[in-house]
Amino acid sequence: MGVANDSSPEYQWMSPHRLSDTVILGDCLYFNNIMSQLDLHQNWAPSVRLLNYFKNFNKETLLKIEENDYINSSFFQQKDKRFYPINDDFYHISTGGYGIVFKIDNYVVKFVFEATKLYSPMETTAEFTVPKFLYNNLKGDEKKLIVCAWAMGLNYKLTFLHTLYKRVLHMLLLLIQTMDGQELSLRYSSKVFLKAFNERKDSIKFVKLLSHFYPAVINSNINVINYFNRMFHFFEHEKRTNYEYERGNIIIFPLALYSADKVDTELAIKLGFKSLVQYIKFIFLQMSLLYIKIYELPCCDNFLHADLKPDNILLFDSNEPIIIHLKNKKFVFNERIKSALNDFDFSQVAGIINKKIKNNFKVEHNWYYDFHFFVHTLLKTYPEIEKDIEFSTALEEFIMCTKTDCDKYRLKVSILHPISFLEKFIMRDIFSDWINGRN
């Protein structure tokens, strides 16, 4: 019997470091460093006391605060040029359907609420185990095109996040009502609140008020003002009406430069590309080579990411050429950045079972499912592709679909093209800038 290690499918079932009913996978030092900066047990006084607190303020007292010179620039939205993280805090950068993401220093920390009644903690580890397994088994530079988490904590009590969200929501509600001279109430209409918040969030006067009230009312090193509307949509979504925000996972990643979808023409040129379309070819080619190399591994021809799209591809600095050999060709990337696949939450490979994906798919799929979805999302994100007739025409070979076999860009039928389809595709002159080191 072989010894299970992190390059084997059995790695996900090993018994790692345990803390009571929690489990840590990966580097405990990284994980404990982050956890030491979080207060998972922070509580606040009942909301009625917060309401009574705001009764001490009116338009005139708020105006005096606005006239104050002090401003905490970390309460601007992060896309605002005035934003600056002046504190060593956790800054909210994204909330999607499956996770709430913060950055602190050079780390990214992702909190994922898990449906504990459907899955055991060890059945929710794909986001850590799949990329780690692939990284340890791939032999060439293609392994650099994968984002591996540094650590993952399973089955942690995450109720503090929902409690924090509610506290900030109530603070914003009462602050806006006071600014407008309205009667104070914790009742709200989602549409009315979001409109009022979005109208004010970029105002320097509003940021001055947040600079005063956030430390006084929230008193937390977790700043959720940035992209708060995304967090609002997550917690207020009707499908989570009866959701128990109890337990879940905490995952720690390296901090990327950008996600691939954030690159526009100006940034593409700044990064060294001749055009935005050349940049798109670059990320498409690197992802293609990664998939081809994965499918070369023994027993890995069942690999699925299940969510291959531009915002799940991250960009990192690349300090040396990336060279990937395929048959008699050599692909050389001298760019100062590299793309890397992230977010393996719904992925599967070899013998690593992922019940989440198993429950979602009714028919068999392979790499083509991912690239069909990838091309659809590329064309939606970057309409500029259409200007390159040769490239856009070639990409259409991946999306020969109809409404009966494709729903929201995802295949509903089983189309199992061999990986050789992708191999032949990237040998075309479309990618000549990188073939045999021509760039």
Curated annotation (Swiss-Prot):
- What Pfam families does the record point to? Pox_ser-thr_kin (PF05445)
Q: How is it modified after translation?
A: Phosphorylated in vivo. Autophosphorylated in vitro.
Give the residues annotated as active site: 307
The subcellular localization recorded is: Host endoplasmic reticulum; Host endoplasmic reticulum-Golgi intermediate compartment
Gene Ontology MF terms: ATP binding; protein serine/threonine kinase activity
Report keywords, A-Z: ATP-binding, Host endoplasmic reticulum, Kinase, Late protein, Nucleotide-binding, Phosphoprotein, Serine/threonine-protein kinase, Transferase
InterPro entries named in the record: Poxvirus_ser/thr_kinase, Prot_kinase_dom, Ser/Thr_kinase_AS
Q: What does this protein do?
A: Essential serine-protein kinase involved in the early stage of virion morphogenesis.
Q: What is this protein called?
A: Serine/threonine-protein kinase 2
Native source organism of the sequence: Monkeypox virus
Quote the gene name from the UniProt entry: OPG054
